[in-house]
Amino acid sequence: MQVTFLGTSSGVPTRARNVSAVALRLPQRSEMWLFDCGEGTQHQFLRSDLRLSQLRRVFVTHMHGDHVFGLPGLLASLGLSGSCQDGVDLYGPDPLESFLKGALNTSSTRIGYPLQVHRSRPAAEQGTLLFEDDELTVRCTPLTHRVPAYAYRVDQKPLAGRFDIDKARSLGIPPGPVYAQLKRGESVTLEDGRVIDGTTLCGPERPGVSVMICTDTVFCDAAVELARGVDLLIHESTFAHAEAEMAFQKQHSTSTMAAQTAAEAGVGQLAITHLSPRYVPGNPVSPDDLLKEAQAIFPNTVLAKDFLSLDVKPCCNSS
């Protein structure tokens, strides 16, 4: 997995930061998922090396404009490109479907590919999986914000152990399609009648990696619980610690709240994003100051910037 930040500002864009959007690359399946889609996100795609044609799923955290105003245009452009035959699944708060229908219908926009909207609320309230396939699961939880908001956690299922090709050769197993079967742990009958158990040629299972997107919210226990042991936590950090009172009023997080969540949850790495546009160069407090505040509590913290890409790596706490 690899994440690419397409927008890291809160509320409004700045010259250096667009509003919220995070792309999750899944190279093993030539697929990409998007978390939030603020205004201008499709322009950010054009400035990156991401391929919009690989977009398969979109997860919306909440319905504030800086997280959704780019979605109708992006979906329309995807339709015009004719490169989305498999369709797109969207997940988000209850009003997401009516928002999209209103924008697309009133603009006479035709989406020429399958588009399905799923509500996140039932899975968040019941603690069930929002999505699952052979390789990945997605869970979500309600956050504490002025409107219904959800954090999303993506977990990769355990990976098969590494295939011992030298051992296979020593047993006289000829290379070819049979190797793929053995790598999957299947039993294979060779031409000479021998039956080879693939599990004897594979090492132990390897843990998959995990990433969680947590925005918008003030510090809350639900976020800590969902984040436990996650490899990469992407957490909003709208305000500096000195403005904690404002953060509580607006139900946003400070840099120290994000770090506290990471520390209590035992995550591998923290990336802070969704910074207030007030923290621009020349102001008394800069984004680097927010980074230092977070690192004082959780040292393995990075400051997200537009077009920053991070490989999701397993941490020792990964569950």
Curated annotation (Swiss-Prot):
GO-annotated molecular function: 3'-tRNA processing endoribonuclease activity; zinc ion binding
Active site, per annotation: 66
Reactions this protein catalyses: Endonucleolytic cleavage of RNA, removing extra 3' nucleotides from tRNA precursor, generating 3' termini of tRNAs. A 3'-hydroxy group is left at the tRNA terminus and a 5'-phosphoryl group is left at the trailer molecule
Enzyme class (EC, first level): hydrolase
Keywords (A to Z) from UniProt: Endonuclease, Hydrolase, Metal-binding, Nuclease, tRNA processing, Zinc
Cofactor note: Binds 2 Zn(2+) ions.
Subunit structure: Homodimer.
InterPro entries reported in the protein's UniProt record: Metallo-B-lactamas (IPR001279), RibonucZ/Hydroxyglut_hydro (IPR036866), RNase_Z/BN (IPR013471)
EC number, as in UniProt: 3.1.26.11
SUPFAM superfamilies membership: Metallo-hydrolase/oxidoreductase
Protein role: Zinc phosphodiesterase, which displays some tRNA 3'-processing endonuclease activity. Probably involved in tRNA maturation, by removing a 3'-trailer from precursor tRNA.
Organism annotation: Parasynechococcus marenigrum (strain WH8102)
CC cofactor: Zn(2+)
Residues reported to bind Zn(2+) 2: 66-67, 216, 274
Signal peptide stretch: none
Family: Belongs to the RNase Z family.
Pfam families, per the entry: Lactamase_B_2
Protein name: Ribonuclease Z
Annotated Zn(2+) 1 binding sites: 62, 64, 145, 216
